[in-house]
Amino acid sequence: MLLYLLRHAEAVDHAESDAVRELTDKGVAQAHKVGKYCRKNGLIPAIILTSPLKRAEQTARIVAKEIPNAEFIVEPTLRAGMQPETALEELRAFSNFKSLMLVGHEPDFSLLAAHLLGTPLREIFHLRKASLTALELDALRPGVATLQFSIPSKLM
């Protein structure tokens, strides 16, 4: 399976709650850029799973509009603060897909990437807003992933 990790695009710093923080104009542009980059380069996930937090869901919707036949599902376990083991458990329900995109948060995605790569967290990179990281997995278990790429939106 090819697993794409997409950190949500830039969001406003303050709102009545963290769950309702929306994308800034720059964040909307970043999300469109990611979606176009995916389409242009054939990075087409079979399905997009997104955190229920507003900024992640907005990012996923925009990216999905840029990708042909992209379906996305709001996945409550992807909310900020998820644990890698919990994410793996949820991903097992989608293990029959060749590719999958998760849209979510930091430091959750760095923790998940480190867990899947079998790398200590201090040796893994920090995923920037609107960055796209791809991991190749032969199985959904710790330590078996291979990093394919990690690219920030400003380089897309």
Map each language-model feature to its residues.
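Non-DNA-binding regulatory cores of transcription-related proteins
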Residues: 94-101, 106-131
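A polyampholytic, Gly/Pro-enriched intrinsically disordered region
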Residues: 92-102, 144-153
